[in-house]
């Protein structure tokens, strides 16, 4: 892509949105604490094959985002912005990719720029592209795979460059989220090819074989990691990645994973999905429904949105963040419908003063809306540290670090994933305990031993609460062994 003036402006706008005040707040919530903790443990331990959280293998997802986070820590140190860098770069790449591919598909500069800007300013996309996690990378992989597939499918001849980009997208998506990274682009491609076959009333075998063959190519990086993981952890480790944490989450058999919601969960979330452009997206879907048979371009993006939405509704495990992979399609549909609205306004400008005003001044009005949205996001970025008190587990880590600096030995009893923040902030591995017996042995060994527990009352084990740190609804107690009065 040539760096034209519109492209440069889009790059600067998206860069400002995604990188402004990226490290001004602590790790917030369980996801950031968990992922940052795993990345730091990977960097400290030197084990880049088996992701581990608080000394236990953590095989919920493949390690691409963890590798990138650990590399950023290695390059820039344990900075908050460093562990968010991979997500922000993935978001920036996704926006620029959408603009470039829409231009290659022959869409006007104004429309391509509008769609990309809508993506960059879509609330769910902006928020997740500024967090530690793998969802921005998943979205980048899915977007690259689907846009490259559509570009390649427009030509009967083999377009090797586009198909290699497709394989790269599959590699990124599957190394980020495993089976889900294959299912999200896969369901779109299947439904789109099925619709095209029904519309054309013929089955073109090469249209089905090419994505299948290049999907196999894209799976090679994941398979290499799984082979190395098998050598380390055996079939159980591979099964945990591919079956327990993928099929189990989809079917609901993996109960411990949580996030199980009723089938209508995402329907309830529609009013807040794809804000602030969701109304344009939904009206666009309705408006374009009659044009899909004769317009493969619109058909593809509508299928992208609807097919993935249906798939996510079928899955037992549901989270609003999973809709991030749909945002590029939502942005394109919203931008296309905005063009339809502008055309309608121009057609009615002779009969309506309002239509004439909106038509004549649509550029400054659109610019004003964009400036307002961007200003709101920048304000939210500056406001983010205010959520630390209820969302950040840094105070727990700070207390652990303080005690260790005083010569105390601290251990964590059955720590949950939120205490991954302790590993990140301390930049060292932590001692963990798995049972009450281990806790008792640890505390008896020395009066300088302190444990972090969530419940300070353990039958048969007298504990003295040294300190308590609360984060939202979570309470962590720093305890030592109580000294009993000899006279009692």
Name what the model sees in each region.
Residues 1-346, 383-386, 423, 466-479:
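Membrane-integral, polyisoprenol-dependent glycosyltransferases
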Residues 339-379:
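Signature aromatic-anchored transmembrane alpha helix within multi-pass, membrane-resident enzymes
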Residues 372-481:
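Short periplasmic/luminal acceptor-recognition loop of GT-C membrane glycosyltransferases, typified by
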Residues 254-257, 359, 407-413:
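Cytosolic juxtamembrane regulatory segments of multi-pass membrane proteins
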Residues 219-220, 309, 355, 364-367, ...:
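Generic N-terminal initiation segments characterized by hydrophobic and/or small/turn-forming residues
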Residues 236-237, 246, 353, 395, ...:
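Exposed alpha-helical structural elements
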Residues 484-488:
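Short, charged/polar, Gly/Pro-enriched secondary-structure boundary elements
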């Amino acid at each position: 892509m040539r760096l034209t003036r519109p492209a440069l402006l889009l790059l600067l706008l998206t860069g400002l949105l995604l990188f402004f005040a990226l490290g001004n707040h602590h790790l917030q919530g369980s996801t950031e604490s968990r992922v940052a903790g795993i990345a730091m443990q990977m960097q400290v331990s030197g084990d880049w094959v088996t992701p581990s959280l608080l000394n236990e293998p953590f095989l919920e997802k493949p390690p691409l985002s963890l590798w990138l986070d650990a590399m950023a820590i290695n390059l820039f140190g344990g900075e908050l912005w460093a562990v968010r860098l991979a997500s922000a770069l993935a978001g920036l790449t996704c926006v620029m990719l959408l603009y470039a591919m829409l231009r290659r598909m022959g869409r006007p500069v104004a429309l391509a720029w509008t769609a990309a800007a809508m993506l960059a300013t879509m609330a769910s996309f902006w928020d997740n592209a500024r967090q530690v996690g793998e969802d921005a990378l998943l979205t980048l992989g899915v977007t690259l795979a689907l846009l490259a597939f559509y570009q390649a499918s427009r030509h009967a001849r083999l377009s090797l460059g586009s198909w290699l980009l497709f394989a790269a997208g599959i590699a990124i998506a599957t190394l980020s989220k495993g089976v889900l990274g294959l299912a999200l682009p896969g369901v779109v491609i299947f439904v789109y090819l099925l619709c095209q076959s029904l519309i054309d009333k013929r089955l073109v075998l090469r249209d089905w074989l090419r994505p299948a063959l290049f999907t196999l190519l894209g799976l090679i990086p994941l398979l290499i990691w799984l082979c190395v993981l098998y050598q380390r952890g055996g079939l159980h480790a591979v099964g945990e990645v591919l079956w327990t944490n993928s099929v189990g989450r989809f079917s609901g058999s993996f109960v411990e994973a949580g996030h199980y919601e009723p089938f209508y969960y995402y329907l309830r979330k529609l009013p807040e999905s794809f804000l602030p452009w969701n109304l344009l997206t939904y009206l666009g879907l309705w408006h374009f429904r009659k044009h899909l048979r004769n317009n493969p371009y619109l058909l593809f993006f509508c299928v992208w949105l609807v097919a993935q939405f249906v798939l996510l509704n079928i899955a037992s495990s549901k989270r609003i963040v999973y809709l991030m992979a749909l945002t590029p399609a939502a942005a394109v549909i919203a931008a296309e419908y905005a063009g339809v609205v502008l055309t309608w306004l121009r057609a009615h400008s002779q009969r309506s003063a309002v239509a004439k005003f909106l038509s004549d001044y649509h550029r400054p009005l659109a610019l004003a809306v964009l400036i307002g949205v961007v200003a709101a996001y920048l304000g939210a970025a500056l406001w983010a540290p205010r959520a630390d008190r209820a969302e950040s587990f840094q105070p727990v880590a700070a207390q652990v670090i303080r005690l260790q600096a005083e010569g105390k030995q601290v251990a964590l009893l059955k720590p949950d994933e939120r205490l991954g923040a302790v590993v990140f902030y301390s930049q060292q591995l932590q001692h963990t305990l798995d049972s009450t017996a281990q806790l008792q042995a640890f505390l008896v060994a020395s009066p300088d031993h302190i444990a972090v527990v969530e419940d300070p009352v353990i039958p048969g084990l007298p504990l003295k609460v040294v300190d308590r740190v609360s984060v939202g609804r979570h309470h962590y107690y720093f305890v030592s062994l109580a000294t009993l009065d000899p006279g009692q």
